Amino acid sequence: GISTREVVLKHKTGSEGIISVSTDLLDYTLQWADDAGVLQGTGAQSLSNDYFTVTKEDNGSRLVITALQNNLADGSNRIQHFVITAQRWTIYVSIQQKYDIAAYKTINLMSFTSGLGYLGTNILGSSSAEARATGLRGILTNQTNFGPDGVVECGGYNLVGVGVNANNLTDALFSLFDVVYINYVPTSQFGSQDAHKLHNWLKTKKNRVLIASYDASDVSQNLLAEILAGKSGIKYFTSNGGPYPLAASTIGNHYFTTDGPFTKNAPVTSNFALRNYDIYHGEIQVNTSASEGITPILMGPGGGIVLGIDYSRRIVYWGDTDMSSNLSGTGATSENHINNTAGTINNDASKLIANVFAWITETVLYGE
């Protein structure tokens, strides 16, 4: 048997669908068919046409269907059929690639006005970003990067600043946002009740993302206590021990250095290290309970995680507020930090950070 007879792909080139195949007859064949089920061509071990490929993986226990073109026609579905034949058994399968209006959704991102790293507001009542967020703000608001015709297709980013009011933030407020960034906000200003509501907001929908700062011992402690639930292993540094090198390359972090939309033509160099702006940052120590489920992207001089993602929980762990700054700081070069406020992607640092937000954007658009 197979897990599904209909595969629905996103509108983008490279969108994939998976069919699990349960059979002892792993030499089964594949053949294109028309809308009436009439076979076309001859049976084969893989299929390819102008729009889709169908290939076997894992000794035939999986079929991977991949879109070869974008479907950008409003209201249209691109449909193709194929047949699986295993001796006397035949199974008719349909592929649909839908135009996806979600791709043009505007992403609503909240950060907090009283904390370092505040991203500012770019809609009614526009306000500037705090100095440690000017580089990232430029990347997010430049529609060459994130926009209807951008590298990542979406409606763009609405950045909204909110004032903190310990234990008085509401569920209704959080519900307005797709992404919440708890920037460098003092622990006294973001209470345990706020943290609990934010955690519930995150768990309620699969297309919401939390960015959690852990830059110092006096910020985000109520949030960390909520999302890590008694786990330990975060260390806070108050001296500059050097830059933040890439974590060891794995399938889990390859997106940010190589496979993501901002690095497909020019990957991040393997010896890249992001500059460590000042003496303060936090690290989630590896092989501790706090690090469980987190894929490392950047490591700190203390051997812990400065930037990482928990994919299953949709949490980005952001250990240094200054990663989003365009200011030089300690040990800066033209390559090792975001070096402009216009959002120009012109070095390894900007490509890496842009890919992190590409993953965030795709999760908001296509999280299920």
Residue ranges and their predicted role:
Residues 101-179, 324-325, 340, 354, ...:
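Aromatic-Pro/Gly-enriched surface loop or interdomain linker
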Residues 1, 6-14:
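Short, solvent-exposed loop/linker segments at the N-terminal edge
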Residues 89-101:
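C-terminal edge beta-strand
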